[in-house]
Amino acid sequence: MAPARAGCCPLLLLLLLLLGLWVAEVLVSAKPKDMTSSQWFKTQHVQPGPQACNSAISNINKYTERCKDLNTFLHEPFSSVAITCQTPNIACKNSCKNCHQSHGPMSLTMGELTSGKYPNCRYKEKHLNTPYMVACDPPQQGDPGYPLVPVHLDKVV
């Protein structure tokens, strides 16, 4: 019996693993093609008046056709979140320097998946009053005319 060749298999396995991770990331963060990153941020995270998480996140899940594990809603208008982009730059979780922290505690709701398969996703709500961090980028065509617009909710502080 010939010895197994070690040259190609580890490389092939690594490539398959990387492809799998890339596909998983695309599915998790996929934004609709007809939306800018800022518009998708607004759809997912801006909710001036609190609503029940089960129905609110259901509207987001329709775009991705899967149950989102966790979603946070900021209870303030988009214009207020965009003003957060004018605070000093700080490092994001991914080490990029385009994050900004809200001026103070803000009302928000976190919805965490507890059970279900799409489209019957069920969420547990947690209401908080705490600062948040957003990643901001220059606006794209179709975005409001702010110097920077929020494109990613980086974390709740």
Swiss-Prot record:
One of its GO terms (molecular function) is nucleic acid binding. Pfam families: RnaseA (PF00074). Substrate binds at K68, D69, L70, N71, T72, K93. GO terms for cellular component: extracellular space. It is an enzyme of class 3 (hydrolase). Transmembrane segments: none annotated. The keyword Signal applies. InterPro entries: RNaseA (IPR001427), RNaseA-like_dom_sf (IPR036816), RNaseA_AS (IPR023411), RNaseA_domain (IPR023412). The keyword Disulfide bond applies. Keywords: Disulfide bond, Endonuclease, Hydrolase, Nuclease, Secreted, Signal. Its EC number is 3.1.27.-. Has a low ribonuclease activity. Belongs to the pancreatic ribonuclease family. This is Ribonuclease 8. The lineage of its organism: Eukaryota, Metazoa, Chordata, Craniata, Vertebrata. The gene is RNASE8.
